[in-house]
């Protein structure tokens, strides 16, 4: 009875939360009202979270059968477990902060459509988080893809924004084929799209590599893993609040969340586990290398997102999905804070994004600089900020796990590079000699400072809260020597100190124009230029070299001209009056007549 009441209250609160967000689409809603609706939805979402903390009981509900076939029933419902309830509140909290910040940032474009797009983006994520079946899951999944296209292309009169939005759609369509493959497999072999039923019905005798490879492909596209990552960098063409929401708590983390959701199946395939581990290791190292050589503040933060997503994928690859979710939750706060701080900085220095042209911002923007410092330290894993509670335990578990040395070394090197590019960002933008030309002094506005304060508090204390109340179900082994336990912290301090020393005491030469990390690993040049060139060149050659020649030479006017020329040449020879032609015609005629007479008479 207690379970039924708890389940009823939990699902009622989840439905109420989503329905309260739909008030944003009323015709008389302005931007302030939409932001208040988001705040109210966050407050309502805390109730099921408190119920879960008290009861420690998952809740799964299904409603009336939507599709009824001979052997296939589909029940729509909600999956209210630790993952759903925790990230539900996190996503609402961060979106509320981003929307309030947008009241200041987008004040020159007072358009409620932007806020409604953000609300729809969040509703798609919440629908995805709470889905207990594949139909709801793919509706939320595709909803995020559509809304990301609209938001990235918000400045639709800019060619770069159009191109970035198309990249996001195309790369995600590649990943979406994997999810469709899994849906087809589950319908054929388990006769169900309910995720819990699929987990129960699948057994070790099934060949799971193809459907699980589809899940990995879907996560690779959505979470911008190696090979399908270029769209995330291009997505910086959208407004900075969109980047903050996209990178922190919605679209890009949905791929990692998909792997966490399907871990009960993934753990049965060692091959898929190894693929996930190596994919995450390549992603985190590659993105960290690229971030270390970028000069655009938004691109540095974007590559840092890709690197952290790779770290989450590595964590799933060492069979610790709870730790991956812990890092996903803490990462949401300081990544949203980093983007909002960068938006404030860019707006102040007249839309300049090159960190080499900044400097001494702590004198001009002391509060924003403090928030940037805290978020960067949390990203590095500084004790005792939010990032420390997730990154430290991940690195400890990675050191104690039986993984191949290449994946371990790549992840450790990426962690060191995180300290390098974060320290470089702090120094060049805040502590070096000022190189700023134009300043736009900020007025004191609660819509600017309140979101930064809330996200800063989250970046400081949320890691402690979630690690206290939501301990992993699968506890890693912590019986390691003290020296090994403090190794990540020592490495963080050492690498940051070395970066400080070299940047202050050595003059670095300009990077080569075709330097691998600064060119994003040549991916834009190869995939967007070279492949497109040859892909378009092939049909051009087919049309010009094959079809045109076939028509022109064999069937077309040139062929007709050749045939007429041959015929006229023959008749011309016959009409020249030579005795040889007449004798030949005479002989042929006589022989034909004799042959005909012999055959018929």
UniProtKB/Swiss-Prot annotation:
GO cellular component labels: mitochondrial inner membrane
Coiled-coil parts of chain: none
Keywords: Electron transport, Membrane, Mitochondrion, Mitochondrion inner membrane, NAD, Respiratory chain, Translocase, Transmembrane, Transmembrane helix, Transport, Ubiquinone
Catalytic activity: a ubiquinone + NADH + 5 H(+)(in) = a ubiquinol + NAD(+) + 4 H(+)(out)
Domain of life: Eukaryota
Biological process, per Gene Ontology: ATP synthesis coupled electron transport; electron transport coupled proton transport
Membrane topology: Multi-pass membrane protein
TM region positions: 5-25, 37-54, 83-105, 112-129, 134-156, 169-189, 209-231, 240-260, 271-291, 300-320, 323-343, 363-383, 400-420, 451-471, 478-498, 508-528, 581-601
E.C. number(s) listed in UniProt: 7.1.1.2
MF annotations from Gene Ontology: NADH dehydrogenase (ubiquinone) activity
Compartment(s): Mitochondrion inner membrane
Chief location: mitochondrion
Function: Core subunit of the mitochondrial membrane respiratory chain NADH dehydrogenase (Complex I) that is believed to belong to the minimal assembly required for catalysis. Complex I functions in the transfer of electrons from NADH to the respiratory chain. The immediate electron acceptor for the enzyme is believed to be ubiquinone.
PANTHER family found in the cross-reference section: NADH-UBIQUINONE OXIDOREDUCTASE CHAIN 5
Family designation: Belongs to the complex I subunit 5 family.
Entry protein name: NADH-ubiquinone oxidoreductase chain 5
